[in-house]
């Protein structure tokens, strides 16, 4: 059976934690930041975890990411 291919777009966007949770960058942080308040921009700066309902579909894109 051939090796499974990793989706390269997903590999650039998501990282797995030690406990197999998936980290992602917050959305709404690219442009038009002037109308967003400083508190909101600070909150959007960090990484967030992917919701449980999306976990399985991302794992299918990255078969070797899960430990």
Swiss-Prot record:
Keywords: Ribonucleoprotein, Ribosomal protein
Domain of life: Bacteria
Keyword Cell membrane on entry: no
PANTHER family: 54S RIBOSOMAL PROTEIN BL35M, LARGE RIBOSOMAL SUBUNIT PROTEIN BL35M
Official protein name in the record: Large ribosomal subunit protein bL35
Similarity field: Belongs to the bacterial ribosomal protein bL35 family.
UniProt-listed GO biological process terms: translation
GO cellular component: cytosolic large ribosomal subunit
Keyword Protein biosynthesis: no
Any one GO molecular function term: structural constituent of ribosome
Disulfide-bonded cysteines: none
SUPFAM superfamilies given in the database record: L35p-like
